[in-house]
């Protein structure tokens, strides 16, 4: 599950050969919080009389490929029944014939089962949870408009809305755990090294300087309180009840959230870059933890993309601006050097405005010492320290963020398999998802430095090279960039396009540009 506990499987108290036994099974499953059902049969067992008719479960059937009894015939019959009744179901059928006394699960069937189970468990975990909007729409970004109907009808998620003044109320009235604040602040001061100050030496106009109401030397104190409060709003905190704040202690039953930030907040208060980065990371001052999908600029559709990615992988989702396509010729013109390796066909500059999960540094190591992104429960103390050491925190550019704050600054210095994705909503079609598998690229320092300094070098950079097919949106790297459906995207460690497609089929999300 998302929290790292093993997935629980329950078995029907009886085999199912009639409607009565199907009802007995359903009654039992209803007491066990079952979100998905897998029926397994080596034989014929009466199609629509035994099928799972519960519209709230994700369904699959494995029909045994054998000759003595017609398991495959039942599979075909019940899949036809599911289709007639409008109940989505997954069909599993082994490639090779098995003997009737063979109790093994063929490798191809096992792969389908695991992929189906990952998606089904993700669907189950989303139901009746909430997307918490902190603020509203950032800078006219369409993804920031929370589509409550989409979240309810496709995901089973409730949309919750919290005005930004609620955060200020809690800071002003001290509605947070003071002991946790001291612990978090101490960790931040010891581990979050400050990078360069882009504002140093600038003669900034009065309208900017007077907009910073929190003194620069108090930014980290404000940011620490802010981070604790955001976490409390999403998940609740029983410590608040002990302090007398019973309603605040409940939280919003969140599974995902986002913060508007720009510009109503950031024009006068420290930005949320640290908060967004550490929420989405696989660790904080308490050690390794479950990542929280948390969207910059409250881009709800990118937040949902983060949620889908982390639910099927257990890894930290990284939020990005899909900023620039660099062709090999353009790189050669600007730097005098050629792209090589995975980057040879060109690269896409993924760079968020100051906040990305620190796991995206690629500083965690696999068993061979290569940079990787791990399931959060597999992060070691060394991995965590490596990610911390690979990141510095540059003071926010006051010309962007008048209220100050600190931006997470790193460069993904590893060649890792990743999957980029994005959910969009298209009028007349509905929600669609784009998926691009590829690799992060570790460019030569000279190339990286010259390209990176052409944008904001206080922000986190990942160079992405998608896998190309020579066709359609994947004709070349330029085509991937040109066909991307929004200004934001998400990367997650590993090539998990097949897992995401399986999940999206359960959610009835259309697939484009695969």
Predicted regions and their residues:
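C-terminal catalytic subdomain
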Residues: 283-445
């Amino acid at each position: 599950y998302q929290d790292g506990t093993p997935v629980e499987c329950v078995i029907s108290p009886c085999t199912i050969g009639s409607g009565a036994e199907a009802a007995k099974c359903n009654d039992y499953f209803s007491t066990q919080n079952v979100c998905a059902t897998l029926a397994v049969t080596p034989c014929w067992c009466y199609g629509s009389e035994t099928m799972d008719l519960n519209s709230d479960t994700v369904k699959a059937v494995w029909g045994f490929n054998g000759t003595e009894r017609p398991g495959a015939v039942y599979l075909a019959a019940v899949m036809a029944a599911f289709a007639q009744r409008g109940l989505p179901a997954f069909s599993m059928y082994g490639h090779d014939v098995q003997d009737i006394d063979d109790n093994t699960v063929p490798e191809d069937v096992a792969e389908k089962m695991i992929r189906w189970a990952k998606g089904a468990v993700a669907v189950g975990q989303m139901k009746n949870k909430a997307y918490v909007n902190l603020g509203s729409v950032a800078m006219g970004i369409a993804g920031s408009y929370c589509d409550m109907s989409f979240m309810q009808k496709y995901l089973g998620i409730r949309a919750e809305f919290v005005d930004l003044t609620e955060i200020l109320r809690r800071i002003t009235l001290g509605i947070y755990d003071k002991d946790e604040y001291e612990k978090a602040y101490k960790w931040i001061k010891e581990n979050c090294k400050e990078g360069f100050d882009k504002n140093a030496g600038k003669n900034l106009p009065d309208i900017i300087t007077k907009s910073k109401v929190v003194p620069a030397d108090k930014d980290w104190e404000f940011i620490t309180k802010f981070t604790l409060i955001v976490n409390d709003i999403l998940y609740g905190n029983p410590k608040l009840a002990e302090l007398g704040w019973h309603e605040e202690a409940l939280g919003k039953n969140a599974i995902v959230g986002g913060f508007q930030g720009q510009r109503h907040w950031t024009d006068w208060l420290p930005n949320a870059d640290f908060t967004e980065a550490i929420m989405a990371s696989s660790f904080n001052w308490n050690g390794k933890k479950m990542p929280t999908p948390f969207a910059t600029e409250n881009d709800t559709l990118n937040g949902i993309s983060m949620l889908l990615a982390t639910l099927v992988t257990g890894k930290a989702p990284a939020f990005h601006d899909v900023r620039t396509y660099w062709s090999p010729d353009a790189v050669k013109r600007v730097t005098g050097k050629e792209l090589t390796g995975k980057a040879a066909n060109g690269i896409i500059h993924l760079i968020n405005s100051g906040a990305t999960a620190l796991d995206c540094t690629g500083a965690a190591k696999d068993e061979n010492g290569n940079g990787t992104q791990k399931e959060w429960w597999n992060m070691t103390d060394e991995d965590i320290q490596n990610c911390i050491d690979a990141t510095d925190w540059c003071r926010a550019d006051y010309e962007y963020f008048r209220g100050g704050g600190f931006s997470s600054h790193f460069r993904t210095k590893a060649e890792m398999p990743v999957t980029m994705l994005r959910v969009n909503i298209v009028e007349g079609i509905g929600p669609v998802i784009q998926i691009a598998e590829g690799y992060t690229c570790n460019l030569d320092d000279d190339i990286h430095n010259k390209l990176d300094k052409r944008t904001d070098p206080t922000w986190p950079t990942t160079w992405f090279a998608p896998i190309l097919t020579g066709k359609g949106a994947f004709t070349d790297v330029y085509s991937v960039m040109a066909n991307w459906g929004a200004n934001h995207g998400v990367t997650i460690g590993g090539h998990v396009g097949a897992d995401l497609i399986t999940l999206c089929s359960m959610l009835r999300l259309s697939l484009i540009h695969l």
